[in-house]
């Protein structure tokens, strides 16, 4: 019996083959634009899927929709039904928690012009956390090689499940729904909500999606730094691909700083001109940056801010303009990394 639980040891040759397979898979994924859209089952959260569908508008974009459920959820008594359901997650009569929400995703994607239900599909399952259901995904692949994945993931909590999913990626963009609560930096250091935790810790850019799809335009903020200019470039490409007008904005804290703000937007406009991306408008303002960005940018579909790359402790000590905008904005906010 002791031998039954003994860990399987791979030979050096087998380990090398596994590493090479993973490296090839990651290299292949890096050549594509991959979006991870997270849902929690509420009607409001499906806005993440609509945003993802509109951003993933070409065949070199892949879309993964994730639903994270807590461990177990009382499924221990239904082992046989669970095994049958996970083998054919989208068609089984017995529904795992979250499956109905993933079925709704297919309907929303069809409404957005992506009819993946008729594509060839592959179902995969992995054991996780000793849970009867584990992790299950259904991948739909178009003839052009485009991938739509519906993933049901088991995790101790939603935030850790989402961040763990990134490690299985990588992803270029995560899309989360509007937070139900957002704590100050001090309280968040000890107890942050799901969206706040993921936004703070995610290695890639994060869009916090609010009900702003009916609005138009990307309100892209810059302070003139090289990090900010990289964010301008990335956000502008996304805006250009989705045919959204671009407004460049910079805020100065004093009148003396206004020339620097004007120079920042002028340099950003020149950068985009070199990329053959048109800028609809440039704007500057004097005041507290967060207040100016939130007040002026909330009329647009998306506010774009540059993440400062600060740790939780650094955010506690120094604060974060990007985090404050995400928290206070009345529209969707793209935090670019």
For the regions a language model picked out, list residue spans one by one.
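Gly/Ser-rich helix-loop-strand patches that form or flank binding pockets
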Residues: 1-23, 45-51, 56, 152-214, ...
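Small/aliphatic-rich secondary-structure junction motif
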Residues: 11-14, 21-95, 106, 110, ...
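Short, well-ordered alpha-helical microsegments
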Residues: 45, 159, 228, 290-291
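Generic structural signal for helix capping and beta-alpha/helix-loop junctions
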Residues: 73, 126, 183, 216, ...
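Charged docking surfaces used in two-component/phosphorelay signaling
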Residues: 120-136, 140-161, 285-290
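A short, acidic, amphipathic alpha-helical segment used as a generic capping/interface helix at domain edges
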Residues: 268-270, 286-297
């Amino acid at each position: 019996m002791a031998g039954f639980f003994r860990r399987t040891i791979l030979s050096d040759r087998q380990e090398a083959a596994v590493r090479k397979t993973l490296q090839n898979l990651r290299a292949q994924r890096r050549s594509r634009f991959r979006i991870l859209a997270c849902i929690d089952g509420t009607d409001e959260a499906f806005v993440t899927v609509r945003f993802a569908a509109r951003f993933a508008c070409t065949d070199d974009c892949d879309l993964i929709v994730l639903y994270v459920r807590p461990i177990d959820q009382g499924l221990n008594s239904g082992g046989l039904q669970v095994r049958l359901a996970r083998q054919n997650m989208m068609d089984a009569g017995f529904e795992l928690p979250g499956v109905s929400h993933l079925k709704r995703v297919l309907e929303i994607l069809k409404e957005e012009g992506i009819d993946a239900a008729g594509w060839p599909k592959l179902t995969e399952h992995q054991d996780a956390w000793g849970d009867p259901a584990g992790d299950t995904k259904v991948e739909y692949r178009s003839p052009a090689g485009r991938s739509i994945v519906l993933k049901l993931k088991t995790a101790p909590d939603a935030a850790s499940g989402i961040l763990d999913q990134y490690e299985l990626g990588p992803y270029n963009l995560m899309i989360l729904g509007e937070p139900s609560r957002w704590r100050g930096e001090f309280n968040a250091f000890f107890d942050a909500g799901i969206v706040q935790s993921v936004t703070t810790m995610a290695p890639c850019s994060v869009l916090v999606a609010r009900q702003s799809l009916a609005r138009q335009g990307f309100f892209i903020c810059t302070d003139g730094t090289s990090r900010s200019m990289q964010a301008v470039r990335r956000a502008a490409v996304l805006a250009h691909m989705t045919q959204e007008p671009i407004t460049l904005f910079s805020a100065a804290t004093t009148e003396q700083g206004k020339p620097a703000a004007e120079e920042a937007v002028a340099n950003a406009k020149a950068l985009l001109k070199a990329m053959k991306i048109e800028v609809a408008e440039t704007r500057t303002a004097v005041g507290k940056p967060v207040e100016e960005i939130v007040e002026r940018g909330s009329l647009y579909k998306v506010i774009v801010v540059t993440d400062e790359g600060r740790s939780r402790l650094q955010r506690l000590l120094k604060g974060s303009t990007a985090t404050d905008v995400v928290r206070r904005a009345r529209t969707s906010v793209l935090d670019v990394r």
